[in-house]
Design a protein with these regions (language model features):
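His/Glu-rich zincin catalytic helix
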Residues: 1-85, 190-292, 331, 416-425
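Charge-rich, well-structured scaffold segments of protease-associated domains
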Residues: 1-7, 82-230, 265, 295-425
Length: 425
């Protein structure tokens, strides 16, 4: 298309190849595995420490999240202010975070300061004290945030759905409460920290402009971390027998609608097909649910379908927030789209569109060494191998309508889905 052409749009080319990053794997002195992606032009380093120490290993509910947040709020030699000021002095960012399965510590730093910051992280790993005043503040803030969240229909619906899918005692299913936050004691945090934050369940992921000097300082610090842990995997809980939950709300204008069911982790043979199928259903702006409920009917601003996968399982869900006057029709249309995928093969044009969309997503995910490191971390921490991304990309390229329909029949039958409504009576 030249500058004067106002009639014909640019040609759309198919993405046939995604260049995967080269991952350098090595082991520290203490046996901790490191996955490194070196590259880029900026003098920035990202280091992620991932411990298998999340909810499945809790002796008491909510302890892994509290441990994650509070472990950097004081050590035997530094209080929280000193730690924060030390990190700020070097212009770095240090965050602790958690998902349901892991505890994560993430550092972004200029290359020249990594050697000064890693000893601070080592102090957190070895000498965290969990000061009572920090625990008290954490409990107050968490309860305040919980009260705010529980005023939102969409939050209540999410909590009810995951509890119904996994069970109220399952690590993926139980919900936070004020009583659980109030019940957290310093001894609980110390126990979880000492029994679950060790070198044997640690994996390190690095990205950026890495060379031998960075590898050396990582080994001289993180490679000397040793703590024997006594982990116990605890996954109790039974899913709810209720298939339909309807809860009233003070929000008189909107109803949160959720559908869902228990699935599997990303190593399951049907994961790729479900990933592709759910994208067609509600995973992008031009998806079937979005085109129907938003663009055509005007029932909602946003409707979405997704698959969440964890180490020990996963689930499929549909999410929509609609005006109360559109609840019945929205549910009818959602079920209609599910049945259509079960009964009718996907047309080639739509298959090609979604393949191109997903391939473009893969390209964006792998843009730069820091993003690449995050992708590799996501794969490894969910029990997959480094080469599983290549397998997924190839599976997307080769996906066919027969495989998609088989997956729809197995997993998208509306009669097998749990339905949650929070809002209108």
């Amino acid at each position: 298309m030249n500058a004067a052409d106002r009639v014909n749009g640019p040609r759309i080319n198919t993405i046939n190849k995604v260049i995967l990053p080269e991952v350098y794997q090595y082991t520290l002195d203490n046996g901790v595995p490191v996955y490194e992606i070196s590259g880029g032009t900026q003098e920035v380093i990202k280091i992620e420490l991932v411990f298998e120490a999340g909810r499945p290993y809790e002796a008491k509910k909510m302890v892994s999240k509290a441990t994650t947040y509070l472990m950097k709020e004081g050590t035997s030699s530094k209080d929280s202010e000193t730690i924060a000021e030390s990190i700020d002095f070097y212009g770095a960012t240090l965050k602790t975070s958690t998902n349901l399965d892991q505890i994560k510590i993430t550092l972004y730093s200029l290359k020249k300061h990594v050697g000064q910051i890693l000893p601070i992280i080592m102090d957190i790993l070895e000498e965290a004290t969990f000061p009572q005043r920090e625990i008290d503040m954490y409990q107050r803030n968490s309860i305040q945030n919980l009260r705010l969240d529980l005023s939102k229909n969409e939050v209540i619906a999410y909590r009810e759905l995951t509890e119904a899918i996994f069970g109220c005692d399952h690590p993926y299913g139980y919900n936070s409460t004020e009583a659980l936050y109030d019940g957290i004691e310093r001894a609980d945090l110390l126990q979880h920290y000492q029994q679950n934050v060790g070198h044997s369940n640690l994996t390190v992921f690095t990205g950026g402009k890495i060379d031998d000097s960075i590898r050396k300082v990582i080994n001289e610090t993180l490679g000397q971390f040793r703590r024997d842990i006594k982990q116990k995997l605890l996954i109790p809980g039974e899913p709810s027998s209720q298939m339909r939950l309807q809860l009233p709300s003070d929000n008189n204008y909107q109803t949160a609608i959720r559908f869902g069911r228990k699935l599997f982790n990303r190593n399951h043979e049907d994961y790729h097909a479900m990933y592709f199928l759910v994208t067609i259903l509600g995973g992008y702006f031009g998806s079937r649910l979005m085109s129907n409920l938003r663009e055509d009917k005007g029932y909602t601003y946003n409707v979405y379908a997704g698959v969440d996968d964890y180490v020990h399982g996963g689930y499929f869900y549909i999410s929509a927030d609609v005006g109360n006057e559109h609840v019945a029709n929205s549910i009818k249309e959602i079920k209609s789209e599910l049945v259509d995928l079960m009964e009718n093969p996907v047309e080639e044009e739509e298959m090609t569109l979604v393949k191109n969309y997903l391939m473009g997503n893969f390209l964006n995910m792998l843009d730069g060494p820091l993003n690449q490191s995050q992708v590799i971390r996501s794969l490894i921490s969910k029990g997959s191998e480094v080469n599983s991304l290549a397998a997924m990309i190839e599976s997307v390229k080769q996906m066919d309508k027969v495989r998609l329909r088989e997956a729809a029949i197995k997993y998208l039958d509306p009669d097998t889905l749990i339905e949650v409504q929070v809002g209108s009576e």
